[in-house]
Amino acid sequence: MCAPAAEGKRFQPAEQLSFSAEDDGVKNPVVIPRDVLTILSKDKLVREELEHEGLPAEEIPSSWFSASAIHLSHANAAYLIVMSVGPVQGANTTMFWAFRPTHSGHDLIFTGGGHTLTAKNTRWNGYREIETLSVVMQKLATVVYRFDGTRYTRYKDKLEEIK
């Protein structure tokens, strides 16, 4: 009788690299740390929704977001991709944020909106490029972001007819 190759090893789900506004959340959710929620509460759209709901920033509902652990760099540390799934989400579009772990918590290194976010296999400064897709004026808008050493910045935009 042959034993499975992975016998004795814990199953680790594949890392999610693509996130969509059409999904109810990420595929392998992780708990969103309190310091990340605090940073999210300072985002303009989130702050406006907190005011609309009559909630103080300290009571930001974690149910408004879904987070997944991802390796954006070659480091062993797991970064977080957070997507809005609650009232901050729009029609067929959502907000995405990426956080880098630090000794004292997390740093916000990406903010962007769209229908889809993909962490690409191509890298810049050791970090995966991030690509967002959205539909604008009945055209497909693609934006590629690159890590500049501190945070992700817009690198390339493309607007094309939907095929």
Segment roles from a protein language model:
Residues 1-47, 119-163:
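Acidic, small-residue rich beta-repeat scaffolds with periodic aromatic anchors
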Residues 57, 85-91, 134-136:
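Short consensus segments that form the blades of beta-propeller domains
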Residues 57-69:
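Signature of short aromatic-glycine-proline-rich micro-motifs recurring in repeat-based ectodomains
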Residues 54-59, 107-110:
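A short beta-strand motif characteristic of beta-propeller blades
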Residues 71-85, 124-133:
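Acidic/hydrophobic-patterned starts of short beta strands in beta-sheet-rich repeat architectures
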Residues 67-73, 114-125:
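Short, exposed beta-strand/loop patches in secreted or surface proteins that constitute
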Residues 97-111, 145-156:
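Surface-exposed loop/turn elements that mediate protein-protein interactions on large endomembrane-trafficking
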Residues 89-97, 138-144:
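Structural motif
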